[in-house]
Curated annotation (Swiss-Prot):
Belongs to the QueC family. The keyword Metal-binding applies. This is 7-cyano-7-deazaguanine synthase. It catalyses: 7-carboxy-7-deazaguanine + NH4(+) + ATP = 7-cyano-7-deazaguanine + ADP + phosphate + H2O + H(+). Zn(2+) binds at C188, C197, C200, C203. It is an enzyme of class 6 (ligase). Its EC number is 6.3.4.20. CDD domains: QueC-like. HAMAP family: QueC. InterPro entries: QueC, Rossmann-like_a/b/a_fold. The keyword Hydrolase does not apply. Keywords: ATP-binding, Ligase, Metal-binding, Nucleotide-binding, Queuosine biosynthesis, Zinc. One of its GO terms (biological process) is queuosine biosynthetic process. The gene is queC.
């Protein structure tokens, strides 16, 4: 790929860890960029740091705590009980308004300073949680906007956009990091590593995908 450096938006969860190792396969130089946005499960950043060190990639953290104060959501506000299932006619209250918009915009500025013009994010439209900023149309639109804003040629890569959680597990296995992703990542909204709490939306999706993948792999 033209320009051999990439910045991975990295939370230390299943999706972004899979993307980190995908990026290592495709780029010579990889930066992992994490964000503190007021999330209740903020220790994910320290787990992310450890994974980045194991992967041998440069790790950075951005303080974006203002994001949590902009909109009401259950990931940053301890007074709000988390939706365990997606409401029929609205976003789940785990949606953090503007999160991916801010993360990708900040990542682009950071990347430009490193001379990197590839951004990698683990958003997916297939196992859709109802988050508008995970849609392919949003990513493509923002890619154009970032290029216009900085007169550069960024490329936003979304390796997981059109695959489901079972296929994401398969990709981790293909990349040789299945056990690392299963045992050392933090996907749980309640901040419990590996298999997590088992009942938040993120854990349910992760478990469902894992069981589906293992049932196919073990045939």
């Amino acid at each position: 790929m033209k320009n051999d450096s990439a910045v991975v938006l990295f939370s230390g969860g299943q999706d972004s860890t899979t993307c980190l190792f995908w990026a290592k396969k495709h780029f010579k130089k990889v930066y992992a960029l994490s964000f503190l946005y007021g999330q209740k499960h903020a220790h994910e950043v320290e787990l992310a740091r450890g994974i980045a060190e194991r992967a041998g990639v440069e790790f950075h953290v951005m303080d974006t705590s203002f994001i949590g104060s902009l909109g009401s959501n259950s990931l940053t506000d301890t007074s709000i009980s988390m939706d365990e299932d997606k409401p029929k006619d609205s976003f789940p209250n785990t949606f953090v308004p503007g999160r991916n918009l801010f993360f990708l915009s900040i990542a682009a500025v950071f990347a430009r300073e490193q001379g990197a013009f590839h951004l990698v994010t683990g958003v997916s439209q297939t196992d859709y949680s109802g988050y508008p900023d995970c849609r392919d149309s949003f990513i493509k639109s923002l890619n154009v906007t970032l290029n216009l804003a900085m007169d550069e040629q960024f490329v936003i890569h979304t390796p997981l956009m059109w695959i489901d959680k079972a296929e994401t597990w398969a990709l981790a296995d293909e990349l040789g990091v299945f056990d690392l992703v299963r045992n050392e990542t933090l996907t749980c909204y309640n901040g419990i590593p590996a298999d997590g709490c088992g009942h938040c939306p993120a854990c349910k999706l992760r478990k469902q995908g894992l069981e589906e993948y293992l049932s196919k792999r073990n045939r």
